[in-house]
Amino acid sequence: MNYMPGTASLIEDIDKKHLVLLRDGRTLIGFLRSIDQFANLVLHQTVERIHVGKKYGDIPRGIFVVRGENVVLLGEIDLEKESDTPLQQVSIEEILEEQRVEQQTKLEAEKLKVQALKDRGLSIPRADTLEEY
């Protein structure tokens, strides 16, 4: 097999369906249409997939340009196995509400953790409270 270095290896994956995981945690699924030397991607017929528990919802995004430095993971989707998922698809409104509830629960748990540490005389410095020297 002949392997090309760097992002040139993605040329073989153009026009195939891919899953892209971004640095901010979002998951995109779409057809890879273009790449460049910086791994910037152009995805077509893109959907943003939101997972909460055993449910997921897809938000249509259309054509999506992704800056290469924001890509954490890029993988081709096997079209034959794509429908064999144990997850249940729900409406956009339902998955967004479940995501909001999950985020609120995590935030409350983090507040309890910080308070417990504070009660013990410990603290974790937060990024927004640190000053640059």
Swiss-Prot record:
Compartments, as annotated in UniProt: Cytoplasm; Cytoplasm, P-body
Position of the signal peptide: none
Keywords noted in UniProt: Cytoplasm, mRNA processing, mRNA splicing, Phosphoprotein, Ribonucleoprotein, RNA-binding
GO MF, any single term: mRNA binding
Source organism superkingdom: Eukaryota
Residues with PTM Phosphoserine: 123
Modified residues (Phosphothreonine): 129
Keyword set includes rRNA-binding: no
Biological processes, Gene Ontology terms: deadenylation-dependent decapping of nuclear-transcribed mRNA; histone mRNA catabolic process; mRNA processing; negative regulation of neuron differentiation; neuron differentiation; RNA splicing; stem cell population maintenance
Start and end residues of each Sm domain: 5-80
Record-linked Gene3D superfamilies: 2.30.30.100
Record Pfam families: LSM
Coiled-coil spans in chain: none
Keyword RNA-binding recorded: yes
Transmembrane annotation, as ranges: none
Any one GO CC term of the record: Lsm1-7-Pat1 complex
Protein family according to the UniProt entry: Belongs to the snRNP Sm proteins family.
Binding partners and assembly: Interacts with SLBP; interaction with SLBP occurs when histone mRNA is being rapidly degraded during the S phase. LSm subunits form a heteromer with a donut shape.
Reported function: Plays a role in the degradation of histone mRNAs, the only eukaryotic mRNAs that are not polyadenylated. Probably also part of an LSm subunits-containing complex involved in the general process of mRNA degradation.
Record protein name field: U6 snRNA-associated Sm-like protein LSm1
